[in-house]
């Protein structure tokens, strides 16, 4: 079994979805591993990872709006408000989604459906640089 590690940095411009599918595919393609498992972790607690539709951008708009209603930016609702009105809502959204993704790799290809993409889901309203740690294992 072989292993490979890689970090992808994504600069966000505030709340929303940031597609990192192409960066991940490009990195996997350069590895000596043809078949295996890829684990991706986000090294933050106020953003998350999702596999979501990549064909219709309205899906991402609807998801963002849904989560903003589910965890509103209202400091009267929360005790943890250290970093502003989006602080605790960002942690709630992160807890309800994923901080890691696991994907099968077959013949150097990510096993994703036709309309699936890999997204960083930024929950904060300010710009951030997010780190996505990739760990590929296989043969």
Regions found by a protein language model. Give the residues of each.
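Active-site histidine-anchored catalytic micro-motif
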Residues: 1-139
């Amino acid at each position: 079994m072989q292993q490979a590690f890689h970090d992808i940095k994504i600069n966000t411009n505030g709340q929303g979805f940031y597609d990192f599918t192409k960066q991940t595919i490009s990195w996997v393609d350069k590895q000596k591993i043809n078949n295996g498992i890829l684990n991706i972790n986000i090294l933050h607690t106020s953003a998350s990872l999702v596999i979501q539709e990549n064909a219709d951008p309205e899906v991402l708009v609807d998801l963002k709006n849904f989560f903003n209603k589910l965890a509103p930016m209202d400091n009267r609702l929360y005790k943890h408000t250290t970093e502003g009105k989006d602080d605790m809502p960002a942690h709630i959204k992160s807890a309800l989604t994923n901080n890691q993704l696991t994907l099968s790799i077959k013949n150097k290809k990510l096993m994703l459906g036709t309309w699936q993409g890999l997204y960083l889901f930024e929950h904060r309203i300010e710009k951030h640089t997010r780190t996505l740690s990739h760990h590929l294992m296989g043969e």
